[in-house]
Amino acid sequence: MKLNKRSVAHYALSDSPADHTGFLRSWGGPGSPPTPSGTGRRYWFVLKGNLLFSFETRESRVPLSLVVLEGCTVELAEAPVPEEFAFAIRFDAPGVRPHLLAADGQAAQEAWVKALSRASFGYMRLVVRELESQLQDARQSLALHRCASQRAVASCSKSQAPDHRAPDPENGHFLPRDRSSIGTVEERGIRPIGRDLTEWELQGPASLLLSMGQSPVSPESSCFSTLHDWYGKEIMELRRGWQQRAKGSQTENKSQNRP
């Protein structure tokens, strides 16, 4: 892997936030000579993304080393010195020595192992796949919940539908229980008993039914096409009566104009 040293050094010293920082003891690593056994060397480490920088001190302006955390694993290890909280960065490439590091305490050791294990792009890809799977499951669950809610609302609406029984006489008029008589009067054009022929012709079946306290609107005829056909028959009756009266007036005029 080829890197621009100046760009890498600028990134290491830039104001971009670091993912983890702290002092660690080092016993050598990839590309560096092995450190003699003993207490190791104490350096300041800075983790930014998948790049681990080491500095001589916290105030140093030049990084000593760089470890690219790809194709590697981070695991606990034994340090050359007892009572050291050590861990190792092991690479999959053959012949590459592990990078042995040690923290000042167990809490620092666990924090470093967690941060370094999550620094690679491979880990980020796994996280993205898991989040995508959770998002898909959440969307499916939400869709099922909405479908169940709509069914529950529809069922509740049907169970709470108003009762279309005949109202009390105090509230107005009665709705007929048997609509067959209405249809017979309407279809055959039979004049109801007690109604004058002129009134029947002028008002038509629908108007007379309304004046008699009978309404064509019912739960079974709530659609527009049914209501349109119902009141259209009234218009046809009115038009037929008008045509008959017009023919009668024309006949009278002709008879009067004869010598």
From Swiss-Prot:
Keyword Coiled coil: yes
Coiled coil: 124-150
PROSITE patterns attached to this UniProt entry: PH_DOMAIN (PS50003)
Database matches in Gene3D superfamilies: Pleckstrin-homology domain (PH domain)/Phosphotyrosine-binding domain (PTB)
Domain of life: Eukaryota
UniProt GO cellular component terms: clathrin-coated vesicle; early endosome; Golgi apparatus; recycling endosome
Domain PH: 17-121
Keywords recorded for this protein, A-Z: Coiled coil, Cytoplasmic vesicle, Endosome, Golgi apparatus
Compositional bias ranges of the Basic and acidic residues kind: 161-178
Alphabetized Pfam families for the sequence: PH (PF00169)
Motif (F&H) on chain: 223-235
Locations listed in the record: Early endosome; Recycling endosome; Golgi apparatus, trans-Golgi network; Cytoplasmic vesicle, Clathrin-coated vesicle
Record's keyword annotation contains Coiled coil: yes
Region Disordered, residue ranges: 155-178
Record's subunit section: Forms homodimers and heterodimers with PHETA1. Interacts with OCRL and INPP5B.
Comment field (misc): Was named after 'sesquipedalian', an unnecessarily long description of a simple thing.
Function: Plays a role in endocytic trafficking. Required for receptor recycling from endosomes, both to the trans-Golgi network and the plasma membrane.
Domain-level remarks: The F&H motif, an approximately 12-13 amino-acid sequence centered around Phe and His residues, is essential for binding to OCRL and INPP5B.
Family: Belongs to the sesquipedalian family.
Protein name listed in UniProt: Sesquipedalian-2
Origin organism lineage: Eukaryota, Metazoa, Chordata, Craniata, Vertebrata
